[in-house]
Amino acid sequence: MKTPSQTHVLGLAHPPLPMVRLAFIGLGNRGVLTLQRYLQIEGVEIKALCEIREGNLVKAQKILREAGYPQPDGYTGPDGWKRMCERDDIDLVFICTDWLTHTPMAVYSMEHGKHVAIEVPAAMTVEECWKLVDTAEKTRQHCMMLENCCYDPFALTTLNMAQQGAFGEITHVEGAYIHDLRSIYFADESKGGFHNHWGKKYSIEHTGNPYPTHGLGPVCQILNIHRGDRMNYLVSLSSLQAGMTEYARKNFGADSPEARQKYLLGDMNTTLIQTVKGKSIMIQYNVVTPRPYSRLHTVCGTKGFAQKYPVPSIALEPDAGSPLEGKALEEIMERYKHPFTATFGTEAHRRNLPNEMNYVMDCRLIYCLRNGLPLDMDVYDAAEWSCITELSEQSVLNGSIPVEIPDFTRGAWKKCHISRTSDLY
């Protein structure tokens, strides 16, 4: 609930931090990968690690020692993360735990004077989204969701093109998370799988789109959501569920517990969103059918079109009927190459790092904190993109009725016209 003295945090900036002191909660697969990434980033000091499974904590500490870094303090147990967040020598807490613990950990961290960087999605319910917003506004701490797809080179190029007017007035965008994860869902956790995993459990109990942010984040940035426009309402529809059951029958037998398991989540979810200014957004989710990986990333405007999947494609007037190919496509990509790609992305290639998106996101986050700049993604992004999980489920369960999307800025979106990232480098 908003207090009388509470104001928005659009454009929030803090004094520069010469050295950013980090702590990590959660050292499973994703958490360890994040920790290892930050060994490549200048201007950071890893102060503390927390993991409920002590074996994972010991392995993470060993990684740092073997890389030549001081061993950070370790915390474990059900309340270890709280004790770590209560320290006064930490600037930024990374939260790489299961979905259901993201919000309470972020809220506690901010209440104890820490900036937070949360793995996706930042929250699972609208109530949790409001908790993140209210806490960030009351504490004046940064709250960033780690949506790495916003730093994809093609996404950044199309963002730059949109900001320079190359697409004309943008009327429609599309995003998705389409990724065949069936083999992972049924693999044992010791082999990196999701068998008996919280993510699989969610698909048994819920429908809608549980993982909207990879597709939604980049296209919301292109539309300048909550910076002159906002998402107004959505309608959502899910197909029947068949993919998980068929896979289980084939691999475990028709009478196996895996094949008899019921899932509420349909194979394909499609969610349509309209903004206050009348622009449309389509977001899809499908992780259980045999098809190539795709996030779509489609941009449609009055002067041109772009789409990353299945192959990068850009078409501009006066020849928009045919996509640019070969050298012509390379030239337009180079012409509109985003400064983040030109700097941090080039550095990632030079150092032969495995994931350019992650490296650019990491460098950019630390760069902003060390230079006292607003972050590229704020708490309103985290709330707006994450709330689609619950709202899409509400729509699906009620015959695809329209569901209103909250204005987490409480009207401040009308007054903020800062172009995303364009004024921050």
From Swiss-Prot:
InterPro entries listed in its UniProt record: Gfo/Idh/MocA-like_OxRdtase_N, Gfo/Idh/MocA_oxidrdct_glycsds, Glyco_hydro_109_C, NAD(P)-bd_dom_sf
Signal listed as a keyword: no
Cofactor binding summary note: Binds 1 NAD(+) per subunit. The NAD(+) cannot dissociate.
Protein EC: 3.2.1.-
Pfam families (UniProt xref): GFO_IDH_MocA, Glyco_hydro_109_C
Keywords, in A-Z order: Glycosidase, Hydrolase, NAD
Keyword rRNA-binding in annotation: no
Gene3D superfamilies on file: Dihydrodipicolinate Reductase, domain 2, NAD(P)-binding Rossmann-like Domain
Cofactor(s) for this UniProt protein: NAD(+)
A GO MF label: hydrolase activity, acting on glycosyl bonds
Residues that hold NAD(+) according to the record: 29-30, 51, 99-102, 119-120, 148, 194-198, 211
Residues holding substrate: Y177, Y211, P212, T213, H214, Y293
Similarity remark: Belongs to the Gfo/Idh/MocA family. Glycosyl hydrolase 109 subfamily.
Biological function: Glycosidase.
Protein name: Glycosyl hydrolase family 109 protein 2
Species of origin: Bacteroides fragilis (strain YCH46)
